[in-house]
Curated annotation (Swiss-Prot):
Locations listed in the record: Cell membrane
Lineage: Bacteria, Bacillati, Cyanobacteriota, Cyanophyceae, Oscillatoriophycideae
Family of this protein: Belongs to the dihydroorotate dehydrogenase family. Type 2 subfamily.
PANTHER family: DIHYDROOROTATE DEHYDROGENASE (QUINONE), MITOCHONDRIAL, DIHYDROOROTATE DEHYDROGENASE (QUINONE), MITOCHONDRIAL-RELATED
Cell membrane among keywords: yes
Protein name stated in the entry: Dihydroorotate dehydrogenase (quinone)
Cofactor binding, note field: Binds 1 FMN per subunit.
Protein's organism: Trichodesmium erythraeum (strain IMS101)
Pfam family, one: DHO_dh
Recorded name of the encoding gene: pyrD
Any one GO MF annotation of this record: dihydroorotate dehydrogenase (quinone) activity
Length: 378
């Protein structure tokens, strides 16, 4: 299937006549949503069965138990792909071990002006300046209730929460809290997103004074002790990351996600953005994909070393191959997420990564993926 995607669909999607990336993204979600909501159709059920055969790969050596949640494999869908849970029950059929929905905000918002999503094929990257476009926390909570997780087996869902654009920075903690209140009984884990470059001032919430206010109020509302994680930017210096780690320890936060998109443009091959004709350094937004591979892995390794491997890490940034995934895991990530790799390589990427990880376990004489976590630091 991966070869079909590369040889047939990839050239169409990335041709000179390619459709707007955001439009194409919506068409994929609409298709998955249709399959998801027509489970009473014999044809649709046949499609779902075929999808499972094509994309799913299971082996007990890939399973982990983290935060008392069972992950069938370590490869998750990164947030941004299914912000509103439009295809909420389809991600297991595509082979994922978990899916993170969102980013969702308390207030429904349209996001930034279009065009706001661009592919950079020369760099195997994506530039986005979406701006947390979503239908709001209440709508996502309703989606969870309607769908009621139709899967007959447990599948972990994360919920990534951001600040509403209309909410002043000084009121950010309340904004995050209101979203959490609406969703706390829906997701299996929650993420405090203070690292997107596409909401004015959001990254300033990574400073300890601002972040502490958010991390102080959420646990009070967290009666069921759901895991809460913090997602950080790749552009932080190690000193700032260490300060966030100290805060995470202080408030007994469950983990950290490294990393979000980068605003760094230095090593990009793309100099002019074809869609606008402007220099890439003048284009706002965050870069995901291959340019992030090395830096995100470095940060994962730093966090693992700073915490002596005691703080669970979800690694994300430039994962295209099983080698990329292995490097993230051995640097210290218990779980990983993909987004841009899925865009460029299609749904077969998950199965390819999982099969490659098993080969790595065999090569190193390991019995489970959990034994590989942080291996490069030992």
């Amino acid at each position: 299937m991966l070869n079909i995607y590369r040889s047939v669909l990839f050239p169409i999607i990335f041709s000179g006549l390619k459709a707007d990336p955001e439009w194409a993204h919506h068409q994929v979600l609409n298709m998955l949503s249709f399959i998801d909501t027509h489970s009473d159709s014999q044809l649709v059920n046949s499609i779902r069965t075929t999808m499972e055969k094509l994309f799913c790969f299971k082996d007990t050596r890939l399973e982990q138990n983290l935060w008392e949640l069972n992950f069938k494999n370590p490869v998750g869908l990164a947030p941004g792909y299914d912000k509103d849970g439009q295809a909420i029950n389809m991600w297991p059929q595509l082979g994922f071990g978990f899916a993170e929905l969102g980013t969702v905000t308390f207030h429904q918002q349209p996001g930034n002006a279009q065009p706001r999503l661009f592919r950079l094929p020369k760099d195997k990257a994506v530039l986005n300046r979406m701006g947390f476009n979503n239908k709001g926390a209440a709508a996502l909570a309703k989606k969870f209730q309607i769908q009621n997780k139709k899967n007959s087996f447990f599948f972990p869902y994360g919920v990534n929460i951001g600040k509403s654009k209309i909410t002043p920075l000084e009121a950010a903690a309340t904004d995050y809290l209101e979203s959490f209140r609406l969703l706390k009984n829906c997701g299996d884990y929650f993420v405090v997103n203070v690292s997107s470059p596409n909401t004015p001032g959001l990254r300033s919430l990574q400073n300890t004074d601002s972040l502490s206010k958010i991390l102080e109020v959420l646990p009070r509302e967290n009666e069921r002790k759901k895991p809460i994680l913090v997602k950080i930017a790749p552009d932080l210096e190690n000193e700032a990351i260490a300060a966030i780690i100290d805060l995470i320890k202080e408030y007994k936060i469950s983990g950290i996600i490294a990393t979000n998109t980068t605003i760094n443009r230095e090593k990009l091959t793309t100099k002019i953005l074809p869609a606008t004709g402007k220099p890439i350094i003048e284009e706002a937004g965050g870069i995901s994909g291959k340019p992030l591979t090395k830096r995100s892995t470095e940060i994962i390794k730093f966090i693992w070393q700073e915490t002596k491997g005691k703080l669970p890490i979800i690694g994300v940034g430039g994962i295209f191959t099983s080698e990329d995934a292995w490097n993230k895991i051995t640097a210290g990530a218990s779980l990983i997420q993909i987004y841009t790799g899925l865009v460029y390589q299609g749904p077969g990427i998950v199965k390819q990564i999982l099969q490659g990880l098993l080969k790595k376990l065999d090569e190193h004489g390991l019995n489970s993926i959990s034994e590989a976590v942080g291996l490069a630091n030992k």
